């Protein structure tokens, strides 16, 4: 039995504040992609879904003359760093196991290479899943962050994903 559910994370005021900024519809879509990918890879779907749900909570909106400046964002982006820290703090506050909170935070930290110097990192499977889940929902110019979802629909999707994770966790899951 999980101590902290996706619904616990999703409904927390801190998560809501940052999910609203980065895009609730995108976060939920990524959580579903991560769930599916993690089940196929025999990786803990709870960790994958939580990391994907929270992967963009470090976003800061870059504007020039009142308009979203995607190029400025790409040049100055550190959202994965801020998001990893925010997610870790939130998960610990909610009672997540420290090791799980760290794994989730690291997956968030490494879901993008926009702030990293050139080169390749050796990412574990969970980290690769969160990156892929984000890529699967991406739209040109960052428009995926602006898709809308009704709050009631969002909650229903999170409830359903929690149920799917509980069912999947009934089987043996290898550690990350």
Swiss-Prot record:
InterPro entries in UniProt: HD/PDEase_dom (IPR003607), HD_domain (IPR006674), HDIG_dom (IPR006675)
Leading EC class: hydrolase
SUPFAM superfamilies: HD-domain/PDEase-like
PROSITE patterns: HD (PS51831)
Enzyme Commission designation: 3.-.-.-
A Pfam short name: HD
Keyword Hydrolase in annotation: yes
Keywords: Hydrolase
Start and end residues of each HD domain: 23-139
UniProt cross-references to SMART domains, sorted A to Z: HDc
Single GO term (MF): hydrolase activity
Protein known as: Putative phosphohydrolase YueE
Organism per entry: Bacillus subtilis (strain 168)
Gene: yueE
């Amino acid at each position: 039995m999980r101590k902290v559910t996706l619904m616990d994370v999703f409904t927390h005021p801190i998560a809501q504040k940052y999910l609203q900024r980065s895009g609730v519809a995108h976060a939920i879509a990524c959580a579903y992609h991560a769930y599916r990918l993690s089940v196929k890879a025999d990786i803990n779907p709870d960790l994958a879904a939580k990391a994907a749900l929270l992967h963009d909570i470090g976003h800061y909106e870059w504007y020039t003359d009142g308009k979203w400046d995607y190029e400025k964002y790409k040049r100055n982006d550190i959202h994965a760093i801020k998001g990893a820290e925010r997610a870790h703090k939130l998960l610990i506050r909610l009672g997540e196991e420290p090791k799980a909170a760290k794994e989730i935070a690291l997956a968030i930290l490494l879901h993008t290479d926009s702030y990293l110097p050139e080169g390749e990192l050796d990412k574990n499977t969970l980290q690769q899943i969160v990156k892929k889940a984000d890529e699967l929902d991406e739209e040109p110019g960052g428009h995926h962050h602006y898709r809308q979802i009704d709050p009631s629909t969002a909650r229903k999707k999170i409830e359903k994903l929690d149920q799917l994770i509980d069912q999947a966790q009934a089987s043996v899951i290898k550690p990350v």
